[in-house]
Each structure stands twice: as structure tokens, then as C-alpha cells.
Amino acid sequence: MNLPRDLKELNAFAFELNCGKYSSVPEFAIPKTNLKDKTSNELTKCIIKDFEVRGGIAYRINTMGIYDEKRGKWRKSGMRKGIPDIIGIIDGTFFGIEVKIGRDKQSADQRVIELEINEAGGIYYIAKNYKDYAEFMNAVFS
């Protein structure tokens, strides 16, 4: 199976997936994807779509607190600090993907989680752009 190596290929793979999902819809009516990786949100969407293209599953993890209107302040989410932005599974292998754009750096809590995931047999990766992430994933599955 060919795997995406860059955003252009990921968009093509994603379009093929959509064509398969909507086989009764004419091709011209199927929306084309325009995935980018300039912001954290865009890169996160790319990675989740990449997991789907590779036959896996992935979920975005929201560790942000919840605004309590009654109290007028934010409450902690209850999620453990340092959990990766994306968790996913491909062929039974657990992945924890931390998305970092620009000068964003890994926190001490995130380093602890990285060690725990690796010690448990999972794979942890810090994604800064889609191309480097795709090279890493293609190396894992080569």
C-alpha cells in the first residue's frame, strides 16, 4: 500500500476515501479536502485524517478546562496533565502524538507521559509539520 508522504498526497488519499464512502454520489459532487499544517488545529486534522487513511483510528484529546457559568470561572477538566493531543491505534499499535507548532515546547508533564507510553510498548511522537510526521509514520510501517 502506498502511504502519503506530503500534504498533496494526503489530500489525494482523503479524496479517494471520500469517493469510497459516497460511491453513489457523482465524483464532481464529492467535496475535495484541502488539508494544511500551518496551525496546531490544521496539523491535528491532518494527522487524524492520516490515521484514517492508514486504516486506523485517532481521537483529538481536549485537556482544556470547562467554563462554569454559575461560578464565572474555569474548572479543571479532570484530564491528567501531559496527555498527548492525539491518541490513536493502527494495526494494534498505540500512538500518542503531541502537536507542537512554532516555538511551542514539550512540558515536563508531557515528557513523563512520553516515557510511560514508550515503556508500555506504545509509540510517542512530537509532530511539528505533516511532512516530518509522514516520514516518521512511513518508517514505522516500512
Listing of model-derived features with the role each one plays in the protein:
Residues 1-142:
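Catalytic phosphate/metal-binding cores of nucleic-acid and nucleotide-processing enzymes, i.e., regions
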